[in-house]
Regions:
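A sensor for short, sequence-defined functional sites
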Residues: 2-215
Length: 215
């Protein structure tokens, strides 16, 4: 059994179950209540799984085979569906540059989006995509090794991770402080923030007026 789900993109239109708006009827999915998963007919990159991120958290109207209907918030059944796991090893080569070996495992929406960009995008700049997947934001980095595992759109295993392995080198993340240091002990500053990327502070001392919206 399945149910027809009609909703809208939450980034453009919030579905209001109490006020009819034809713009609410923009996205069509099929919901499988027994397994709590969705089929998205108009997105090639999706298979049977969680609802796409652009409708999560929005309201929708669910219609069953008897034409009975109900309104409900679209939720993610598996709270650990979308993750990014990183393993990073840093080696300082003669204290002149850092060699960064990294393995990244993307699951859920992260994996789906990366596969779609790699396989379906007509405007993809391969160099920009490679930069994005190999610690973007580091000035003057050199990519020594770069490989992707499980990159095809079709994956025989549910929520198979999209894995990126890379080795890069960069001088910009290692700063020599010995020029101004009069002590005999040599000191260096390693810019860890550039390696792990920009972090967002989601907490606040004041009560939020609107909920956090993450894209």
């Amino acid at each position: 059994d399945f149910e027809l789900l009609i909703t809208s993109n939450r980034y453009f239109n919030r579905f209001d179950p109490d006020f009819f708006n034809p713009d609410n009827l923009r996205e069509i999915l099929f919901y499988l209540p027994e397994v709590k998963k969705y089929i998205i007919p108009d997105k090639k990159e999706y298979r049977v799984g969680e609802a796409p991120f652009n409708v999560l958290g929005n309201y929708g109207i669910y219609i069953d085979k008897n034409k009975d209907y109900y309104f409900s918030t679209i939720i993610e059944n598996d709270k650990k569906y979308s993750t990014i796991n990183r393993t990073i090893n840093v080696d300082f080569k003669k204290m002149k540059e850092a060699v960064i070996s990294e393995t990244q495992e993307f699951t859920g929406h992260w994996a789906i989006t990366n596969r779609a960009m790699l396989n379906l995008s007509n405007n993809l700049n391969s160099d920009e995509f490679k930069d994005y997947l190999t610690t973007s934001g580091i000035k003057g980095k050199k990519i020594i090794e770069y490989s992707i595992i499980n990159k095809d759109i079709y994956q025989p295993i549910y929520n198979n991770p999209f894995i990126v392995k890379s080795i890069i080198s960069a001088e910009s993340v290692l700063i020599n402080n010995n020029k101004t240091n009069k002590k005999k002990t040599k000191r260096y500053t390693f810019n860890l923030g550039s390696v792990i990327g920009t972090q967002s502070e989601l907490y606040s001392n004041n009560k939020r007026i609107n909920p956090i919206e993450i894209r």
